[in-house]
Amino acid sequence: MKLKAMYSFLSDDLAAVEEELERAVQSEYGPLGEAALHLLQAGGKRIRPVFVLLAARFGQYDLERMKHVAVALELIHMASLVHDDVIDDADLRRGRPTIKAKWSNRFAMYTGDYLFARSLERMAELGNPRAHQVLAKTIVEVCRGEIEQIKDKYRFDQPLRTYLRRIRRKTALLIAASCQLGALAAGAPEPIVKRLYWFGHYVGMSFQITDDILDFTGTEEQLGKPAGSDLLQGNVTLPVLYALSDERVKAAIAAVGPETDVAEMAAVISAIKRTDAIERSYALSDRYLDKALHLLDGLPMNEARGLLRDLALYIGKRDY
């Protein structure tokens, strides 16, 4: 099922969330709001708000409350993108100039911080201390993941568990929190809240692994940035780690560094694609996806459950 068809069930609610996002990024200091709006208008799948809204269907659904949760989670995601672009020295995001490219590195960092603060402000509207604590802890873990990404650049000897821990913090926990907080804010029973949290966690792991695969298999037009950007920026992802076990390409990959030019990198990327690294990466993504789908079987049967399944399958099987 296409993403647009999946979203049709929530189209009016997502439109309301989008309007709330525009209000949330506004600032009395014009340039901050302008930069945040620049990123917001670049678009995106709004995966996290969708998970919030669907998870809330397992409790007492109240759009006015859910808007605050959905906006808070999307703002964290936006903040992490702004910071990532600084870390990776990226000039394009979704086919548009990044904030750091259009303004500056320093301005981008403060814009990211501003979005984190706005996120906490939005969640405070719920008046739910536990939800606020979950959100704050999620921000802490996202920041830890960002620091780990900096430390792990060009570290081709890192074990698989280091990569998995990093993507858990940078990606999976935010999707897990989206599911958890949607259900929590709707007053869903605790066993359902926990089940949705772990569903989101496993979907998030599959999501990031698939994203890392697409960096090698997608086109610049599909990705909104040059293919192979992760490796070019020193980010050691799952396909790279698996390819390092192939002696034919190990030396070439290990030689990659900040001075490697685009032509040399293109040759390394082609070599990686000739190994079984992509297939092995998809296999691990599928394992996480299977765990997520199994958890859905224990949820009450409703339309949201079916859409969560469709969304999980889309995330794990998408080709761009």
From Swiss-Prot:
All-trans-hexaprenyl diphosphate binds at R93, K170, T171, Q208. GO terms for biological process: isoprenoid biosynthetic process; menaquinone biosynthetic process. PANTHER family: ALL TRANS-POLYPRENYL-DIPHOSPHATE SYNTHASE PDSS1, GERANYLGERANYL PYROPHOSPHATE SYNTHASE. This is Heptaprenyl diphosphate synthase component 2. Mg(2+) 1 binds at D84, D88. The keyword Transferase applies. NCBIfam families: GerC3_HepT (TIGR02748). Supplies heptaprenyl diphosphate, the precursor for the side chain of the isoprenoid quinone menaquinone-7 (MQ-7). It comes from the Bacteria. The gene is hepT. SUPFAM superfamilies: Terpenoid synthases.
